[in-house]
């Protein structure tokens, strides 16, 4: 079976090894005579899977014991709401505006109080990561977006603040090593580097969690999930099962450092073509802010970009069109995208340039 070169921005490529394992045991999970999707979330088999998934995540990310790990439904967009609902307890909440997803988070924050931009990269169409920040007194938290899928930028070093830091890591979690202790809350939708859509990983410092509001509907309170081991209601069992498989795969590759090394090599293949194209391909992100996850670039005209995407699709490259809001082209090289796929795309880009220069 020939597999597509999958550069979709999310849901995105998953390790073939993981898919094959899931296929093999789909009808009979651990000799129970049942599929994992048929089993009670109160069963011993699922309880073991649930606990192991948290343990693997804690090990791979080096999450300290004073941090809670939760599995929540609703996607990253619901986290825009939940973070503000629980923690916007002072006069202001601050957001660093590095693109569409940061702005969406900020829009949800407005439902719970005043918000403001601590910094913004909008002046240059979000092609860089701000380095200077202004915080007002009485600020509840600062919200960061670690990686910007649409514009192809990411923080190389995270800034330090004197207020709690909340970070959306949906598109780069486990792609590189981060110091969890630098954050009070991290959230990440699974559908880019962790598994399929359907579950969000939330990592929160217990002392920060203790400051959350409790006068909220049950399913909007983080304490509901923390106090019930994310089992207050039926969790997204299959999504968590696939996250478990993916975490095992990451560990087998050598852990986060090995994954990060491979990701840097993959991105370099494509950025090198862009940089050596004499302007045929124009990278959107400033070199010092380039994402290893989402490589964004433009060609001379929108018509040429459409032709590039169409010919790329015919050659087996899926998902290389830019986001509908900004156009252009984008290759999303998440953890599970193999090096061979990036080599093939780089070769296709070279060939297309020769034919159209």
Regions from the PLM with identified roles:
Residues 32-79, 86, 100, 108:
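Conserved N-terminal alpha-helix of the aminotransferase class I/II PLP-enzyme fold
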């Amino acid at each position: 079976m020939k597999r597509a070169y999958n550069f979709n921005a999310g849901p995105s490529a998953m390790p073939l090894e993981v898919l094959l394992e899931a296929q093999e045991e789909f009808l009979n999970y651990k000799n129970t005579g049942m599929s994992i999707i048929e089993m009670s979330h109160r069963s011993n088999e699922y309880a073991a899977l649930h606990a192991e998934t948290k343990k693997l995540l804690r090990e791979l990310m080096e999450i300290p014991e004073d941090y809670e790990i939760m599995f929540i439904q609703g996607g990253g967009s619901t986290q825009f709401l939940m973070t503000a609902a629980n923690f916007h307890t002072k006069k202001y909440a601050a957001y660093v505006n590095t693109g569409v997803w940061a702005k969406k988070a900020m829009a949800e924050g407005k439902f719970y109080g005043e918000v403001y931009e601590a910094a913004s990269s909008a002046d240059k169409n979000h092609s860089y990561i701000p380095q200077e920040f202004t915080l007002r007194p009485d600020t509840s938290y600062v919200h960061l977006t670690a990686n910007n899928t649409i514009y192809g930028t990411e923080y190389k070093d995270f800034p330090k603040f004197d207020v709690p830091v909340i970070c959306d890591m949906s598109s780069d979690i486990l792609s590189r090593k981060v110091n969890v202790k630098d954050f009070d809350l991290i959230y990440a939708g699974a559908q880019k580097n962790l598994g399929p859509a359907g579950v969000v990983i939330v990592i929160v410092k217990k002392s920060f969690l203790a400051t959350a509001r409790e006068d909220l509907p049950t399913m909007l309170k983080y304490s509901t999930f923390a106090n019930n081991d994310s089992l207050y209601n039926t969790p997204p069992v299959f999504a968590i099962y696939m996250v478990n498989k993916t975490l095992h795969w990451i560990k087998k590759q050598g852990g986060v450092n090995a994954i990060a090394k491979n990701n840097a090599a993959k991105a370099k293949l494509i950025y090198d073509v862009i940089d050596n194209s004499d302007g045929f391909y124009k990278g959107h992100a400033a070199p010092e802010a380039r994402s290893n996850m989402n490589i964004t670039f433009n060609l001379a005209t929108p018509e040429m970009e459409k032709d590039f995407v169409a010919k790329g699709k015919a050659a087996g490259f899926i998902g290389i069109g830019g986001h509908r809001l900004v156009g252009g082209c984008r290759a999303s090289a998440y953890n599970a995208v193999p090096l061979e796929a990036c080599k093939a795309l780089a070769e296709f880009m070279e060939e297309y340039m020769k034919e159209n220069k």
